Amino acid sequence: MIPLSHGLILAAILFVLGLTGMIIRRNLLFMLLGLEIMINASALAFVVAGSYWGHADGQVMYILAVTLAAAEASIGLALLLQLHRRRRTLDIDSVSEMHG
């Protein structure tokens, strides 16, 4: 069995990696990937903590996180497709520009 500290450190590293990917990259697709990594890191923390304390709550929260990630991915990809069709780019800065 993996110690609690090792699992939580791995989850924290993955979360920081996803957060860094969201902050640094300006491409909407890479921002969605960073968000998915962050959601999976938090789900990993729930599973590790649930395994450590011997409760099934961690697995239940993992199923909830996977459901949330699927909904987020479908909405995010729909927005990504609309942005690409209208602007011919995936750069997030092009959305914030004002056109008049």
Swiss-Prot record:
Cellular location(s): Cell inner membrane
A GO molecular-function descriptor: quinone binding
Membrane topology, from the record: Multi-pass membrane protein
TM annotation in the entry: 4-24, 28-48, 60-80
Record GO biological process: ATP synthesis coupled electron transport
Reaction(s) the record says it catalyses: a quinone + NADH + 5 H(+)(in) = a quinol + NAD(+) + 4 H(+)(out)
EC code(s) of this entry: 7.1.1.-
Keywords in alphabetical order: Cell inner membrane, Cell membrane, Membrane, NAD, Quinone, Translocase, Transmembrane, Transmembrane helix, Transport, Ubiquinone
InterPro entries xrefs: NADH_UbQ_OxRdtase_chain4L/K (IPR001133), NUOK/Mnh_C1-like (IPR039428)
Gene Ontology cellular-component terms listed: NADH dehydrogenase complex; plasma membrane
Residues in coiled coil: none
Keyword S-adenosyl-L-methionine (UniProt): no
Keyword Transport: yes
Family: Belongs to the complex I subunit 4L family.
NCBIfam families the UniProt entry points to: PRK05715.1-1 (NF004319), PRK05715.1-2 (NF004320)
Biological role: NDH-1 shuttles electrons from NADH, via FMN and iron-sulfur (Fe-S) centers, to quinones in the respiratory chain. The immediate electron acceptor for the enzyme in this species is believed to be ubiquinone. Couples the redox reaction to proton translocation (for every two electrons transferred, four hydrogen ions are translocated across the cytoplasmic membrane), and thus conserves the redox energy in a proton gradient.
PANTHER family cross-referenced by the UniProt entry: NADH-UBIQUINONE OXIDOREDUCTASE CHAIN 4L (PTHR11434:SF16), NADH-UBIQUINONE OXIDOREDUCTASE SUBUNIT ND4L (PTHR11434)
HAMAP family referenced in this protein's UniProt entry, alphabetically: NDH1_NuoK (MF_01456)
Complexes and interactors: NDH-1 is composed of 13 different subunits. Subunits NuoA, H, J, K, L, M, N constitute the membrane sector of the complex.
Protein name in UniProt: NADH-quinone oxidoreductase subunit K
Native source organism of the sequence: Sodalis glossinidius (strain morsitans)
Name of the gene encoding the protein in the UniProt record: nuoK
